[in-house]
Amino acid sequence: MPWAALLAGMHATVSPSRVRGRARAPPSKSYTHRALLAAGYADGETVVRDPLVSADTRATARAVELLGGAAARENGDWVVTGFGSRPAIPDAVIDCANSGTTMRLVTAAAALADGTTVLTGDESLRARPHGPLLDALSGLGGTARSTRGNGQAPLVVDGPVSGGSVALPGDVSSQFVTALLMAGAVTETGIETDLTTELKSAPYVDITLDVLDAFGVGASETAAGYRVRGGQAYAPSGAEYAVPGDFSSASYLLAAGALAAADGAAVVVEGMHPSAQGDAAIVDVLERMGADIDWDTESGVITVQRSELSGVEVGVADTPDLLPTIAVLGAAADGTTRITDAEHVRYKETDRVAAMAESLSKLGASVEERPDELVVRGGDTELSGASVDGRGDHRLVMALAVAGLVADGETTIAGSEHVDVSFPDFFEVLAGLGADTDG
């Protein structure tokens, strides 16, 4: 079946398969978002090299344009003309589609404009929380509100903010901190954030600091949160920035190799150089489970072979995007896998804790859902093919496709088109490794 037809049908069928070969993980979605907006904050032209071009990152590029910049695709790169320290007042509503990162980061950028900006998104995004960011921007001198009064989009933002100090929780989304740091660098006085609760997904703020540094912007962690000086200029060396590979996306390929590599063969994933990404922890998780895996950090190549896996306990406070992958690994491993610190994973594109519990149960796994945990008892039952729903969540779709490689019979996943959010050619790459995904 042609790939276009497969995706147009909004479902994918995966049958038991053995995989082998080399693949390249897509560029990092997190880095691409930040690089596009950082280039927007810059004056003049910046080339963002090797970006991820997906539904989510296209939403950020469109937002940069509506704020007065330009973003053109040239030879696989994104050439961005910045709007500088003062975005324009958009002449249309900014539609962030399904991208929470776009909405959070651009909401703070919009608060720099001398006027009103309206942001919205699809049904899933309109159900996600933004209240702490709205309160923070209002506390910094702007006006930011939810039209429904519940902290959810549509959002209306009035600026400009000039900077200051603000308190906000750290356990809802680290993207609030990222948004304030990126915008704060071009305010008059800078922005200091004091976190009132423990920061979840802290490595994503590390990614932000990494990108800011590459663009010549200084920001730092404090005893209570983070601080960025005002009056800074975004100016990357050589007016360009190269995006690293994405460990979140690579996790599905690595899991496929650990569970379904052919005898005597391996799955080799290229483009995986060390970076600030917390999801590089997937390598450690696989090692702890007993996988035969090797990471050559100098060449950026990870090699994994099939082996017997054992259950482990893994906290995902800093790596929420890995929960679906780890849950699938646990379902195919011996013993119990306990995924902890997972309450915030319920507030992604969907409630990933509940969704994975439901889907893995349909496939025959023994799963227990708790408020802050997902417990998967591997080895209790054999996985069997079934029809499961990706719930409009790209990470669920890809994780369940990996489960389909080792389930008995066909696994049909609804909503397969949503891989376009972060890994548009996922099914083509999986087929290139030998997976039977043509139904």
Swiss-Prot record:
The UniProt record gives the binding positions of phosphoenolpyruvate as 29, 100, 128, 175, 352, 395
Q: State whether keyword Cytoplasm applies.
A: yes
What is the protein named? Answer: 3-phosphoshikimate 1-carboxyvinyltransferase
**Localisation per UniProt entry:** Cytoplasm
Entry function: Catalyzes the transfer of the enolpyruvyl moiety of phosphoenolpyruvate (PEP) to the 5-hydroxyl of shikimate-3-phosphate (S3P) to produce enolpyruvyl shikimate-3-phosphate and inorganic phosphate.
Q: From what organism does this protein derive?
A: Halobacterium salinarum (strain ATCC 700922 / JCM 11081 / NRC-1)
The family database entries (NCBIfam families) matched by this protein are listed as: aroA
Tell me which Pfam families the record gives. Answer: EPSP_synthase
